[in-house]
């Protein structure tokens, strides 16, 4: 995909940073990225061409938008070089993030765009990685994210709407980054996530009464992992492995030893669904479900979910279905890049002057 795409991909012209991130992160989880400097340079050049109003648009000369800004930032994080980090205009990016903040304390996706917890998470994640989590930017944001929790236990895209796996991840990741998970009912969230794992297939559905979809291996599986990280009421704390960091100035996450995730959901059943049903043989790549075609989005998030399920929490050993060769590196539960890459980016931007 990074060498060139067919004409059919013209429909994704406004998703260029996403394509770069999906492919780069998938390669990184397969430990096939770091040796290819030419791919990294070409990706940086592509992302630079998408810069707009201090942030990133979906393609060259397109409107600045929080979603491709998030994707571009994560792709640059995965690349992890000074050249990649220098592609970010931090003062202009911060001005853009501030301009997207709404009176509700959520964030608009773009100028005059919709306000929801996606915009909120993407803004806060980018701000955390680039060390611009200022009091002005974060004021009231945690309360907005918490207000999206529904009677079901999950989170909707905005207050008062149906709980959904993607929005649930965005909400709980925002709260973890801001250290504000005390504002929500984590037990209800865990129960909702557990109910989204299907009994027969073993994968996750995105909402109640929907079909299984491999991408929710991460959106729901990552939510379960974040919930485990978020439980700070227990006095027994352990350090997160591999330097899992959440924001500048925090050397490692301190998380309690709480109920293992595998007692809430079944990581082995999930991994079997990903490996046996979502994987495309013999050509490679991953898909939503059997009968669907492979694509870069599902390849990225199915692999991310596979990683999250293999590293379920900070106190448990690896949980691997099948051959030990199936084990992937850990992915950061809030940013979905490898933790060492997140630390490298945090260190780089923490060394710059405050804005």
PLM regions: where:
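Terminal, non-catalytic domain-edge segments
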Residues: 1-11, 15, 21, 26-29, ...
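Internal amphipathic alpha-helical repeat/solenoid segments
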Residues: 1-69, 82-86, 108
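Solvent-exposed loop and edge beta-strand segments that line ligand/cofactor-binding
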Residues: 5-17, 55-67, 107-117, 155-165, ...
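Residue-level detector of extended alpha-helical repeat arrays and alpha-solenoid scaffolds
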Residues: 20, 69-72, 120-123, 168-171, ...
